[in-house]
A protein has these predicted regions:
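N-terminal active-site beta-alpha-beta segment that forms phosphate/nucleotide-binding
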Residues: 1-110
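Surface-exposed, charge/polar-rich loops and edge strands
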Residues: 1-5, 9, 16-20, 105, ...
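Short glycine-rich anion-binding loops that position phosphate/pyrophosphate groups of nucleotides
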Residues: 50-53, 119-123
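Short beta-strand segments
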Residues: 48, 73, 116-117, 152-154
Length: 187
């Protein structure tokens, strides 16, 4: 089976697990993320506006915005890295590419921490996204300039120890789930 076929199969299984976990989400997951982000108060960070069954980081983003700049990703074109627009709680939002909400006014910012949505993850820091490569290109670009922390935010059910990965896949530094924090590279 080709790598692309293995990735498609892994995505399909992970989407089903994520959907089931999302149905049980009582909204407490964001507190674990808030706890992690509290150690980085004031550091520019980017979250994301959850879509469909993605775990929602909004409460943690609102808390972080009280201490420093928070952005959300903006897709500028196929094959391009993401840019980030400054987000403020309660600010006007509009539909962006693929239906993700983006700020109505685009004040660009550069994050040092990315809270990353995903379809599946591994404890080794592997991340399977939707297949567009946006976060891989973005992390590669940001990490070429400075240390950039990538925090996966997911349901524990999205873990896949046999994640099919490519050399261009950028690793996560940690993963936050409703069951706790997984620090990549630490036993």
């Amino acid at each position: 089976m080709s790598l692309e076929a293995r990735k498609a199969q892994a995505r399909q299984a992970a989407f089903a697990r994520r959907k089931a976990a999302h149905a049980l989400d009582d909204g407490c997951c964001s507190s674990a993320l808030s706890g992690v982000l509290a150690g980085y108060r004031g550091v520019p960070l980017a979250g994301y506006m959850a879509m469909r069954t993605e775990i929602d980081p909004l409460a943690a983003m609102e808390e972080a915005a009280a201490h420093g700049p928070v952005g959300v990703p903006v897709i500028t074109g196929k094959g391009q890295p993401l840019t980030f627009a400054r987000w403020v709680p309660g600010g006007a939002m509009v539909d962006g590419t693929f239906g993700a909400q983006v700020p109505a006014e685009m004040a660009l910012m550069e994050p040092e921490i990315l809270v990353v949505p995903l379809v599946a993850f591994s404890r080794a820091g592997g991340r399977l996204g939707y297949g567009g490569g946006f976060y891989d290109r973005t992390l590669e670009q940001l990490r070429a300039r400075r240390a950039t922390l990538a925090i996966g935010f997911a349901y524990a059910a999205q873990e896949d120890p046999d994640l099919p990965l490519e050399p261009t896949d950028q690793p996560l530094d940690m993963v936050v789930t409703e069951e706790g924090v997984i620090e990549v590279g630490k036993v």
